């Protein structure tokens, strides 16, 4: 088990988790009652298997922990808790954190600098998050730090490093790669036209295939209306991989809302 040289707060086990309150966020509002029940069951197992560790004075409570667990389990709702194997701890800073980053350039020189990170994940090792960006992950805006890092973990199940191609049947790999690169190019074209700040999809998606998969996974679950119509072929591949269709949930929820309004008249 990793020992960290600073004082940390761990969430205790056997909590009486406030699931009803934890579910009351825009990200989860379109789940059916059956999906919510299964998500809670997965989140309970997640909290039994993983340590949530608060760093640098940040304080966890049962509601924060329950919501974190629910979001962690949303991408694996139809895949199973075993898809989150490979790490045992979630480290949570109060805000984005500074790390020492090293990289090698084209001629072999190694460079290093201090950079601010929102989150990090590795194939073997903890997931590192920060509370400010977790808070921004509760809505349905297309941004979700937890889903982003979970997507990297799912991606890395297919090899030593994230490639943008998760563990899918071999026959589907070429098509997935083609559609993912087409999406990256389309996003880059929009960035070139309107600039990063005005792009409708986070510009980070154009960085490389691994980041494209992670960023579009955020949109898949939290803003399907921005993903599905723009990249319909890739959307279907995401639906097949995650075994979910958030766009369909959104349509059903909207239809039920319209029906309810008509019934009141």
UniProtKB/Swiss-Prot annotation:
Q: How is the cofactor bound?
A: Binds 1 zinc ion per subunit.
- Oligomeric state and partners? Interacts with Mlc.
| Cystine connections | none
| Compartments it resides in | Cytoplasm
List the GO terms this entry assigns under cellular component, sorted alphabetically.
Answer: cytosol
Binding-site residues, Zn(2+): 111, 148, 152, 211
Give the protein name, as stated in the record: Mlc titration factor A
Q: Please, which domain of life does this record's source organism belong to?
A: Bacteria
Necessary cofactors:
Zn(2+)
Main function: Involved in the modulation of the activity of the glucose-phosphotransferase system (glucose-PTS). Interacts with the transcriptional repressor Mlc, preventing its interaction with DNA and leading to the modulation of expression of genes regulated by Mlc, including ptsG, which encodes the PTS system glucose-specific EIICB component. Shows zinc-dependent metallopeptidase activity.
Q: Which organism is it from?
A: Salmonella agona (strain SL483)
Instruction: Tell me its family.
Output: Belongs to the MtfA family.
Q: Which GO terms describe its biological process?
A: proteolysis
Record flagged with keyword RNA-binding: no
């Amino acid at each position: 088990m990793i020992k960290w040289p600073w004082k940390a707060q761990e969430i205790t086990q056997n909590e009486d988790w406030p699931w009803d309150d934890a579910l009351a966020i825009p990200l989860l509002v379109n789940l059916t009652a059956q999906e919510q029940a299964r998500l809670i069951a997965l989140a309970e197992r997640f909290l039994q298997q993983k340590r949530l560790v608060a760093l640098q004075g940040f304080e966890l409570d049962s509601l924060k922990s329950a919501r974190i667990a629910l979001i962690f389990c949303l991408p694996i709702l139809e895949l199973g808790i075993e898809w989150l194997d490979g790490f045992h701890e979630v480290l949570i800073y109060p805000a984005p954190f500074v790390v020492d980053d090293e990289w090698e350039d084209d001629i072999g020189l190694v460079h290093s600098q201090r950079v601010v990170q929102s989150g990090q994940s590795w194939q073997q090792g903890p997931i590192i998050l920060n509370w400010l960006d977790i808070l921004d992950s509760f809505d349905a805006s297309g941004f979700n730090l937890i889903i982003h890092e979970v997507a990297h973990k799912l991606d890395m199940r297919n090899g030593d490093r994230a490639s943008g191609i998760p563990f899918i049947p071999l026959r589907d790999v070429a098509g997935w790669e083609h559609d993912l690169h087409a999406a990256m190019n389309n996003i880059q074209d929009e960035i070139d036209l309107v600039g990063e700040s005005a792009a409708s999809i986070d510009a980070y998606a154009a960085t490389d295939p691994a980041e494209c998969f992670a960023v579009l996974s955020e949109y898949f679950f939290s803003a399907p209306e921005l993903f599905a119509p723009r990249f319909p072929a890739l959307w279907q591949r995401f639906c097949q991989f995650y075994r979910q269709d958030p766009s369909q949930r959104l349509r059903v929820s909207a239809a039920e809302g319209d029906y309810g309004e008509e019934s009141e008249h």
